[in-house]
Amino acid sequence: MTIDSGFNHITVLLDEAVEALALRADGCYLDGTFGRGGHSRLILSKLGPQGRLLGFDKDPQAIATGQALAAEDGRFVIVQRSFAELGAEVAERGLAGKVSGILLDLGVSSPQLDDPERGFSFLNDGPLDMRMNPDQGISAAEFIATAPVEEIARVFKEYGEERFAGRMARAVVERREKQPFTRTADLAEVLKVANPAWEKGKNPATRAFQGLRIHVNNELGDLEAGLEAALDALEVGGRLAVISFHSLEDRIVKLFMRKLVKGEADNLPRNLPVQHKVFEPKIRLIGKAQFASEAELKANPRSRSAVMRVAEKLR
């Protein structure tokens, strides 16, 4: 497998995210979304000989890049798993409750988006796939070919926040009865015609494609599972930094952290005797939500929607 796919990726909030982890030279850290290794390389540069870094990714190309890095640096290990499974991985390695910091950089990477053969983009024609790991799960084409119109509309609306979801789903089903969808450009054209009110400066297929990608990869389900697993994996004083790129992701992260800041009392029945510690917060927030600087926005326009939230485990 070729390590350098020819598509560049500029790591978003690179310095800010690594700084947020408050690295210890001998700490054990976890990069839940290795990608092309931007964050991981910077973390490794700040760790001492006893420091360790464990990387996760589903994408075979990312794994190839990670394996090359692991061959260069014995402090680093890469595993081909979703960060939703980090709990099982750290348990197998005897690291549960011992991880010093965890970073999650959510969403699709530039190499995935820019490579037409991955099928993520409506701008460049390619096979309608959209899977982070092309060897697992069903492709976007398979979903579109078999799902009922109501399910397609739900995906467009719930995950893409597309207000014309029903109309676009009906257009998709009407067309697939004549000819199946196999290419991204083909689907994008049908969605374009079915969208009566394009947003200025935005491709009419944008939201529907986002919805499909999130559904095919179970991105929100993985995020919810990954956040819970991350909290259990962290040691007391360990930090969790999460970078999200759209409101659905950020809402999940924000609500998760808000719940833990309040403690567990809100989830208990009224008038039930409880120990005092359930009223105590499990985490504390580190600063406010962070966004890309003006300089980063100019250098990398894709960073405009990035928001990072950071928390520290208290108990």
Swiss-Prot record:
SUPFAM superfamilies per record: Putative methyltransferase TM0872, insert domain (SSF81799), S-adenosyl-L-methionine-dependent methyltransferases (SSF53335)
Q: Where in the cell is it found?
A: Cytoplasm
Naturally occurring in which organism (per UniProt) = Pseudomonas putida (strain W619)
Instruction: Give a GO cellular-component term.
Output: cytoplasm
Q: What is this enzyme's EC?
A: 2.1.1.199
Molecular function per GO = rRNA (cytosine-N4-)-methyltransferase activity
- Name the reaction it catalyses: cytidine(1402) in 16S rRNA + S-adenosyl-L-methionine = N(4)-methylcytidine(1402) in 16S rRNA + S-adenosyl-L-homocysteine + H(+)
**What is the name of this protein?**
Ribosomal RNA small subunit methyltransferase H
Similarity section: Belongs to the methyltransferase superfamily. RsmH family.
Example GO biological process term?
rRNA base methylation
Q: What does this protein do?
A: Specifically methylates the N4 position of cytidine in position 1402 (C1402) of 16S rRNA.
UniProt xrefs under Pfam families:
Methyltransf_5
Q: Which residues bind S-adenosyl-L-methionine?
A: G37, G38, H39, D57, F83, D105, Q112
Key word Hydrolase present in the record? no
Q: What class of enzyme is it?
A: transferase
Keywords (A to Z) from UniProt:
Cytoplasm, Methyltransferase, rRNA processing, S-adenosyl-L-methionine, Transferase
In terms of NCBIfam families, this protein maps to: 16S rRNA (cytosine(1402)-N(4))-methyltransferase RsmH
Database matches in InterPro entries: RsmH, SAM-dep_MeTrfase_MraW_recog, SAM-dependent_MTases_sf
